């Protein structure tokens, strides 16, 4: 019996959209501009789906269209697509200009935030010379191990194995439930099952 629990995590909702409308919502690589008014089409198509609410859909759609990956895809020559991936409209220049400006502002904010969080070097003070003091040796701090996720190979995967699925910029944890040739079925921790290729799985 399929779970009817509502999805509340935005990443899980995006994963659901990637699975349900793969020709419209692109999980990896270059995206395509979405049709104007697509939210209404999306709400109507999922009207009987108890997993998602209109509010959560709107939040997920806003995150998708605000991502750097999406904004880079709003460019000259690109065409808008509908839920089924059909081209339906030309991009207007003002929308391209707006995407370029929004991308630059977002990148500038991210750069400023990184600089603000970076440790600042204190100004050097000229102190009077004193007799050298005996320094007490302090143990060097032990750095926390860095866990680096790497793409999996099909032969390394097995059922019931804990993995991370690469969906957009954020890996989503889940468990391998089935392996069929080159396709791997993974049940995400949100309860959603998604079929991906081995190279989209991180270990």
Curated annotation (Swiss-Prot):
SUPFAM superfamilies per UniProt: FinO-like (SSF48657)
Domain of life where this protein originates: Bacteria
InterPro entries: ProQ, ProQ/FinO, ProQ/FinO_sf, ProQ_C
Gene Ontology annotations of biological process type: post-transcriptional regulation of gene expression
Cellular-component GO terms for this entry: cytosol
Presence of keyword Cytoplasm: yes
Subcellular location: Cytoplasm
Keywords: Chaperone, Cytoplasm, RNA-binding
One matching Pfam family: ProQ
One Gene Ontology molecular-function label: RNA strand annealing activity
Role, per record: RNA chaperone with significant RNA binding, RNA strand exchange and RNA duplexing activities.
PANTHER family to which the protein is assigned, alphabetical: RNA CHAPERONE PROQ (PTHR38106:SF1)
NCBIfam families, per database record: PRK04950.1
Family: Belongs to the ProQ family.
Listed name of the protein: RNA chaperone ProQ
Annotated organism of origin: Shewanella frigidimarina (strain NCIMB 400)
Gene: proQ
């Amino acid at each position: 019996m399929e779970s009817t629990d509502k999805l509340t995590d935005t990443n899980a909702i995006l994963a659901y959209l990637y699975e349900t409308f793969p020709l419209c919502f692109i999980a990896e690589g270059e995206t395509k501009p979405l049709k104007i008014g697509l939210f209404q089409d999306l709400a109507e198509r999922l009207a009987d789906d108890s997993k998602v609410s209109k509010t959560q859909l709107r939040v997920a759609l806003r995150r998708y269209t605000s991502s750097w990956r999406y904004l880079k895809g709003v460019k000259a020559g690109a065409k808008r697509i509908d839920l089924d991936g059909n081209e339906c409209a030309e991009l207007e220049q003002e929308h391209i200009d707006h995407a370029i400006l929004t991308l630059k502002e977002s990148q500038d904010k991210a750069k400023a935030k990184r600089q603000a969080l970076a440790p600042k070097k204190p100004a050097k003070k000229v102190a009077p010379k004193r007799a050298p003091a005996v320094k007490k040796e302090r143990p060097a701090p032990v750095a926390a191990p860095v866990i680096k996720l790497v793409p999996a190979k099909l032969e390394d995967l097995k059922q019931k194995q804990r993995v991370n699925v690469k969906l957009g910029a954020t890996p989503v944890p889940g468990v391998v439930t089935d392996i069929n040739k080159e396709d791997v079925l993974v049940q995400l921790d949100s309860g959603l099952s998604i079929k991906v290729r081995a190279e989209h799985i991180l270990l």
